[in-house]
Swiss-Prot record:
GO terms for cellular component: extracellular region. The record marks M26, S27 as: Reactive bond. The keyword RNA-binding does not apply. This is Alpha-1-antiproteinase 1. It comes from Equus caballus (Horse).
Length: 53
């Protein structure tokens, strides 16, 4: 069977392919101010123990 007609043409790398990606403009995240004490506990159900307190 002749597969030469189905071959994908090779392309060379251009200058644009080697440049660094462009910077994506992003806004700063909202500022979070906590005025009261709080407790955060991360608990693992498999081991039945706190992972972070």
């Amino acid at each position: 069977e002749d597969l030469q007609g189905d071959a994908v043409p090779e392309t060379s790398a251009t200058k644009d392919d080697n440049e660094x990606p462009e910077m994506i403009p992003m806004s700063l995240p909202p500022e979070l101010e906590i005025n009261k004490p709080f407790i955060l506990i991360i608990y693992d159900d498999n081991t039945k123990s706190p992972l972070f307190v």
